[in-house]
């Protein structure tokens, strides 16, 4: 098994560990040995315990002490996730995929992705670096998600949609097919996007 530490001792971090543990349990050859959390929040001290796993210290401390470990960044805010990825660029960032996600074998996805339980990623879809696809979200066929995109639970990105980098979809939002969502845009809970929108648009 390969050592893995989680950045972010919080709800998303707990979900990541739960997903890894379930994946390990279902595998004949478990892949990951979870060694703990790294977190810069000063409320955490090195050696603390968070729900059964040790705090390894700050990001820099964990990176120094475990230089060969893989890292999963369990941070929902896109800009913060991007910053952490730069800071820890010497590590590898595996994708974590829930056993109950449905992913087409023709799907391309890159490092650091998280695909939650019940998510569906259809044929021909492309997922960029450090993408989050939340529980029961759907990426329809031939859609493209850029880097550091976060799809909240129940979100639907329709067929052929191009989602540029750093876009946030909150729960149960959706798009029409074959449109473009500009870089840095925010789609709020339950909102639908009917036509292409430019960068940094809030819907």
Task: Name each model-derived stretch.
Residues 2-21:
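Glycine-rich adenosine-cofactor-binding loop
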Residues 20-24, 88-90:
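Short, solvent-exposed amphipathic alpha-helical segments in soluble enzyme
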Residues 14, 18, 82, 195:
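Alpha-helical elements of the RecA-like P-loop NTPase motor core of helicases
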Residues 2-4, 33-35, 68-72:
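Short active-site oxyanion
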Residues 6-7, 38, 74, 188:
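Short hydrophobic segments within beta-strands
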